[in-house]
Swiss-Prot record:
Subcellular location per the Swiss-Prot or TrEMBL entry: Cytoplasm
Gene assigned in the entry: Slfn8
A Pfam family hit: SLFN_GTPase-like
Expression sites (tissue/organ): In T-cells, expressed at relatively constant levels during development: expressed in immature CD3(-)CD4(-)CD8(-) T-cells (DN stage), in CD4(+)CD8(+) double-positive stage (DP) and mature CD4(+) or CD8(+) thymocytes. Expression is slightly reduced at the DP stage.
Protein name as catalogued: Schlafen family member 8
Amino-acid positions noted as binding Zn(2+) in the UniProt annotation, renumbered to this chain: 280, 282, 319
Amino acid sequence: METHPSLAVKWSCPDLTIYAGEVTIGEEDRNKMDSKKRKLEKTRITEAACALLNSGGGLIAMQMTNKSEHPVEMGQDLEKSLRELIMSPNMQAFFETKQQEDQFYIFVKSWSCRPEDGSTKPRICSLGSSLYCRSITSKVAMDSREAFEFLKDKKACIKYRPTDDGAPPAKIPRAMCQNSLESNPAFEIFQSKKLEYGQCLLFSESTSIEFKQFSTKHVQAYMKNIIPEYISAFANTQGGYLFIGVDDKRIILGCPKDNVDRDSLKTVANETISKVPVFHFCSSKDKDKVSYETRVIDVFQEGNLYGYLCVIKVEPFCCAVFSEAPISWMVDKEKGVYRLNTEEWVRMMVDFGPEASSKDLSKDFECQLSLCNSPPHCRPVYSKKGLQHKVDLQQRLFQVSPDCLKYTPESLWKELCSQHKRLKGLVKQQIRSFSCGLLILYRSWAVDLNLKEKQEVICDALLIAQNSPPILYTILGEQDEQGQDYCNHTAFTLKQKLVNTGGYTGRVCVMTKVLCLSSQNNIETNGGSVSPINYPSSYNLANIQEMQDLLQALVIVLLNFRSFLSDQLGCEILNLLTAQQYEILSKSLRKTRELFVHGLPGSGKTIIAMKIMEKIRNTFHCETDSILYICENQPLRDFIRAKRICQAVTRKTFMNYRFKTNSFQHIIVDEAQNFRTEDGNWYGKAKAISRRVKSCPGMFWIFLDYFQTSHLKESGLPDFSRQYPREELTQVVRNGDKIAEFLQKELQKIRDNPPCSIPRQSLNIVHEFKWSQSVSGNIKTEQFTLEDMVIYVADKCYDFLRKGYSLQDIAVLFSTDKEKKTYESMFLGEMRKRRRASEMNHAYLCDSNMFDSIRRFSGLERSIVFGINPIATEQPISHNLLLCLASRAMKHLYILYFSTPEGHSSTEAC
């Protein structure tokens, strides 16, 4: 990673600030400067602006070398450079300036690719693409917009280009163009062994031919300078020949042998070309190679060796060739200002999101934040269709009313005021000048932003008000010298997340103010903020619409989680929690040490379990080895273990006397309805571990769903009446409509005739069942002989794979682990036949991870689920087993029973 040598990141205020050193400001004074120094200053300012545009916006601070009592303009050269950077005459769209005494500031708004002038903009901002192409006889540098279109076309071309016999797409254009280059009139000269000084070539410059002279004695430096750009231009167009040693009149001059020798010419050319960066969209094995050939031809004068002509034949490249790494910068408080490498730059430029890789995504999910109009670091955000949109979530959680300043959540405000007598008066004094907006209170805003909690903080309050920038108030009981740093860091993180996660594209900086209950004099009492810099009024939220836009970005910041679809789609996307899930997650952990969460199938219990473990780490400043996650089955254990947020074990391992529990303080139990007591009292042991530090007991949260009970034995849970405090998750977010309808019917059957091991009171939750209706899904129930069933499943899997699904989308589940072991090899064998008989290269079909038992697969999900003869060995839980099976399927559910050949029957719902 290349860091900037002369740009420093400052920590003095809650914004991303780059200090650019001493700079001359003002047109008159800049015109008097030494041209080299003026250019260096301009480059430094432009690179700082590029870094901030690409990193969420911020502030460029500089010390004015020319003292002035009156405001001065920036300077025409600086303004022009910034306009060229954003490719727009409207500099005010991204920049504002302010002079304070001898300090000059440029306020930078985050870059976004939203088309403001009707033209498409690239995903990131760059000073130069380092991509070249040929235009008739010229080498042309592509600007960022042209580079974006070029890369987009290359990616699309590779994606849809046919191949012969499975050959990499890269091989086809290279072979096709070989004959074209050899038929070029320059090829005959390229093949020559000697030429005459002063000879006139019979062809001229063209798209595929360029003449350059050795016009300097510094031959090697000259070649290193020109070769990369021409290699890029020819390779990105149709290939061609670079003649070094021919003038514009087609006369061969060569390079005198006194200035260079033959071997060094070829070595310099080859070494220079070997350093040229390339990027592949295709599957070419020649990942780092430009295909070229260098010839050094002797040039004779009157029969004597005079010098050498260097000719480089360049073949067209399958993807993209650069002259050097693109010139694009980013900034981070930890890394400083750093330059993107070629791969990082290309991936950000052509990051179109998951729409291009999944046609079904738009059918099943609604886009909440798209990459096509958001800042560079944003990830796309989707919610399952039928769930609340970010606009609806904002209205429910953070509603803004005209001429009304509200405190939210009201219950927390009342609780805090009852605990701290001076709090109400102090806060009201701070915000008395605001009449429209919200004061959003948290015990710790830091925890909800994935930062460490500061225990001395009574609460944090975020003010979103009209005619004001956002202000974060940190309220302390006693004076604390670290309080302002905490507040600044929290505000800075919030601002960055509003832009880079929430997708907010307006101007924003979260101002800070630390208040102390014990102090008799909190100096600023008019709602102002502690900041050494006066921000422009454009950073104020001007009206309710701007407040709502910011609050919708805040909804994404607070409710997002990494979608399980990310791994399947090959790119990171985010989903949003439901309001019901968020309300459980936002509970104060210090006040809710123990909690039973009852959730209906597909309501997101495991998601909440993962999110709560992340919150535990930040609230209690603990490491992953202090948090223990316990479940019944190995697949769910492995899934959680891969997240690296805790130590994950099965209940059986937890109860093993060899298992050491000394380091654990917090315990999360998932799928607890399927626990057993055969190895001892797991509940008593877990509770004792979480309570062993009496002065600060740990967290003990239990997630369960009695409807998904898969056995009739004692679970070890306390009586239902003693499961308190208790919360419920009743909104199904996983399954398609037809599957959800099936779940509802099975839930009612269990409710009407429950197994004796399930407490009847726990089943009343079924009356609250609801799901998001809009994703269709389908269910099919069939009866087959074993032989026909194996063929049916293999055919269906093959069809799904041809439609673009992967093996990670499919699960084949058996009633018991014994049946899985008995029949798995038969299903695998039939699937391998399909692979061998087709052109599809699914070598990984040999992997058996898609096969499991219904019980072991508890807590996991797949788009497509086959249930193989789902008949419970214990009749009272037959509907529970069916419910467990169905709840694993998001879109397609196949319930397949064994029958005699004569007994085949079929029912379908779709």
